[in-house]
Amino acid sequence: MNIYTRLKRSNCIYYDVKLVKNGKAVVAKALYDTGCSLREPVTGSIVHIVEYETIKPVLEGDEKAEQRIYVIPYNSVGKKDGILYAVKIDEMIVNREEQEVTIREPILAIYEGKLSGKGYYQIILNSEFY
């Protein structure tokens, strides 16, 4: 393992997160990303990122979900003027160092692929989540 990989891993903060919508829930691993500052452009609400396959079980059967889609513009390394589509769920519960943090009606941008090539996490938490 090279020095860059070791430094990168040592600075990562992971949390267990529960996503809840309409009585359905999924649990996944999240990366707290100090560089993630996504916001919904109209309200200014913070936005987190989730893999589609992770959130799919809580969205299934919600016919009205398509009517409540948010469009989130973003820029990142290698991607200028990107767009992510987002949804609002009932709550997100973050298990943070022996403490649960409940976020009511969080906005989650949906990413079609894998956020972590090695599967370490399925959610990226906005740097301002707490």
Predicted features along the sequence, with ranges:
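Cytosolic, membrane-proximal regulatory domains of ion/volume homeostasis and mechanosensation machinery
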Residues: L38-E40, S45-Y74
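Intrinsically disordered, low-complexity segments enriched in polar/charged residues with Gly/Pro
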Residues: N2-L7, T34-G35, G61, G78-D81, ...
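Generic "edge-of-domain/loop-turn" microfeature
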Residues: K24, S37, T54-I55, Q99
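Aspartyl protease catalytic core from the pepsin/retropepsin fold
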Residues: Y15-L31, A65-Y130
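Canonical alpha-helical transmembrane segment with a positive-inside/aromatic-interface signature
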Residues: M1-V42, I46-I49
